[in-house]
Amino acid sequence: MTSNFNVEAGDKLYIQDVTLRDGMHAVRHMYGIDHVRSIASALDKAGVDAIEVAHGDGLSGASFNYGFGAHTDWEWLEAVADVLEKSVLTTLILPGVGTVEELRRAYDIGVRSVRVATHCTEADVSKQHIGIARDLGMDVSGFLMMSHMIEPEALAQQASLMESYGAQCVYVTDSGGALDMDGVKARLEAYDRVLKPETQRGIHAHHNLALGVANSIVAAQCGAVRIDASLTGMGAGAGNAPLEVFIAAADRKGWNHGCDVMMLMDAAEDLVRPLQDRPVRVDRETLALGYAGVYSSFLRHAEKAAETYGLDTRTILVELGRRKMVGGQEDMIVDVALDMLKEQQA
């Protein structure tokens, strides 16, 4: 049934910042404690509803496969918990990567909202994590990654599973930045056919086809109350929907969001952009992610493999897309590069 949320009627959007989680990918998980503290404080003062903090691949994502971080999840979370006054401290967990024990530890630090993330066809593995998070009294969202890879009706059935486990919100998560506005609309309309009106909908956009803001606007018009975004778009690939840009566009439409756009602009330019060792933007490599429908966090791994083996990053990414590789298969990027090198030398 249709979502209870109506942005055009003045209902307030729920702005979820992901600068300190998805943004970890953009800096290879190397945020310092002072960085996360200052960014979180600025976001809190600017009025965002929630701030997500974790390794880019969620709690306990630090590994040889995903990459190690400058600090532990607990150090980052504790630093942010110390400075928040209004925003809800949020984290992300992937069943099979993060355990329920880590979820409990995050709760003890002050996390009160969690997104339980699975590949778009694997909602069934989220049942335990969603259930325990609800038992802890947390706000819980289901996060269906790579939502472009299956048809809207199939995605909606996965969303329905997450709802049945206790998720209070279910996201269309465009991890590859491969959806356009029609694709977002079709998926949220499919959600309407199976989800309860009181179950919130969310959108997590990536900007690989430069559609992050447009997709988020369409999602809100289709009943999505929760909007993921990050300062300067700080995130995997070409980044997420840039928060300050989305809020400016929402202001132009007269939507209710509760954020100060000027403060967000300042935080983006003064605190976040200087940290980018690789510009977060649409360029030939990040565009290839959206074009091929590849998991956005593969970017830095593919660039490293291309440099090591003398290949073009784009050809690696396109081949990963052809093979339909998904999040968690980062170790296969080197295998693909070696296969391509053999073909060149044959």
From Swiss-Prot:
Mn(2+) binds at residues 22, 204, 206. Substrate binds at residues 21-22, 175, 204, 295. Its EC number is 4.1.3.39. SUPFAM superfamilies: Aldolase, post-HMGL domain-like. The active site is at residue 25. GO terms for biological process: catabolic process; L-leucine biosynthetic process. The record marks 21 as: Transition state stabilizer. The keyword Lyase applies. InterPro entries: 2-IPM_HCS-like (IPR050073), 4OH_2_O-val_aldolase (IPR017629), Aldolase_TIM (IPR013785), DmpG_comm (IPR012425), DRE_TIM_HOA (IPR035685), PYR_CT (IPR000891). It comes from the Bacteria. It catalyses: (S)-4-hydroxy-2-oxopentanoate = acetaldehyde + pyruvate. It is an enzyme of class 4 (lyase). Pfam families: DmpG_comm (PF07836), HMGL-like (PF00682). Residues 13-265 form the Pyruvate carboxyltransferase domain. Keywords: Aromatic hydrocarbons catabolism, Lyase, Manganese, Metal-binding, Plasmid. Transmembrane segments: none annotated. PANTHER family: 2-ISOPROPYLMALATE SYNTHASE 1, CHLOROPLASTIC-RELATED (PTHR10277:SF9), HOMOCITRATE SYNTHASE-RELATED (PTHR10277). Belongs to the 4-hydroxy-2-oxovalerate aldolase family. This is 4-hydroxy-2-oxovalerate aldolase 1. It comes from Novosphingobium aromaticivorans (strain ATCC 700278 / DSM 12444 / CCUG 56034 / CIP 105152 / NBRC 16084 / F199).
